[in-house]
Amino acid sequence: KLLDALIYEAERQGIMRYPIHVKIDSGMHRLGFTLEDMPRLSERLKSQTTVMARSVFSHFAGSDEPRFDAFSRQQIALFKECAVAVQSATPQPVMRHILNTSGITRFTEEQMEAVRLGIGLYGISACGMDTDLRTVSTLKTTILQIKELEEDQTVGYSRRGVLTRRSRIAAIPIGYADGLNRHLGNRKGAVVVNGKRAPIVGNICMDVCMIDVTDIDCKEGDRVEIFGEQ
């Protein structure tokens, strides 16, 4: 239905050869065309020139766990069969890709024309193997203000951040509206200031959170790493 709606709208606007990426459901059972859909999909792609498949892809359900290797190989075989149907219905070459982060590591012979590195971009190995992955992204901010507070004073909403000693508390301009998970507040999470961990104190606010820099040599304007190499 979605493909039909896309073709209809593209035809209505006079669009030709609009590039699309065809998702195959090879066993994840989330989204995509099934093997049973291939005859109808093939005919639909051949019957028009409004959209053109640029790639065909699928997604593993358990490539990070060796106990699912037989199922993962079934997914690969089914995907390849479906990919042939899509390729035969399209006049130009169609890229194939099924490998996610753990698939890249564990099924190296199935790289085809492209791979999709997901959680690996953050330096995390989904399959637990020592792959020497390194993060390629860093999020930094700066210290807005530092306050000297006394023992038993509180920081933030609901007075959740109760200080157990005289402390230096820094405010940094990032909060849950920026995607910083509120569950990381109340010392459950930390950031890095000048190479040292600074716990998040109290509840994380919408645009600001507070960190404990009592034992860190820092000043207002210093860089704070939210995530990255450190």
Please describe what each predicted stretch is.
Residues 1, 24-25, 59-60, 99-102, ...:
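Fold-independent oxyanion-binding glycine-rich loops
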Residues 3-19, 26-142, 149-150:
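Active-site loop/helix belt of alpha/beta enzymes
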Residues 19-21, 54-55, 94-96, 113-114, ...:
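Structural motif
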Residues 148-230:
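C-terminal accessory subdomain/extension
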